[in-house]
Amino acid sequence: NVNIDLEERLSYEIVAAVMEGTSDIGIIANSVDVADLETFPFRKDRMTLVTAHEHPLAERGNIHFTEALDYDFVGLHEGSALQDYLSEHAARIGKRFKYRVRLRSFDAVCRMVERNVGIGVVPLAAANRLKKSMKIRAIALLDPWASRELIICVRRFDDLPTHAQQLVEKIRTQ
């Protein structure tokens, strides 16, 4: 009998929880410092632009990040690993985000995008999940950096309970 408590958190919060022992397993972006944790490759994660159905960009099939930066944004809060990653790429092309609001979750970002407060960038998996219940569109980002690696992290794999080791192995083979 195994219970799984699944929480969506920012990568750096997941690393802290695994390091502190409050979480056994984490799935994070490889852009975060994992200190002494053991890591395993998981899968690629594409970033995508999300817009409200009535936004001027909504009918685009794809877009370069630099074009999107001309619009108002709904972003993740300061210190978010993903938002820092995106800000780095904006700075490399000499641009900055024009934030209308910054929030703590992909769900909250997409809810504000749905209300046409601005556009946002979220993982494609989150956009695909959320567009089932929200009136948002997902537009592919053409930039090569928009694809990032996700990794599984644990303190020490050999110290995990058997059922947790089996879960890690099952996740890795999906």
Describe each model-derived feature in a short phrase.
Residues 1-35, 103:
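Central regulatory/effector-binding core of bacterial HTH transcription factors
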Residues 27-36, 88, 92, 106-136:
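A ligand-binding cleft/hinge motif common to bilobed small-molecule-binding domains
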Residues 36-73:
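Flexible hinge/capping segments at coil-to-helix
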Residues 10, 64, 104-105, 123:
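Short loop/turn segments at beta->alpha junctions
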Residues 57-58, 72-93, 160-169, 174:
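Secondary-structure junction motif
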Residues 137-174:
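A late-sequence structural motif
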Residues 38-48, 124, 133-147:
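Short beta-strand->loop
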Residues 18-19, 68, 111-117, 152:
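Hydrophobic residues within well-ordered alpha-helices
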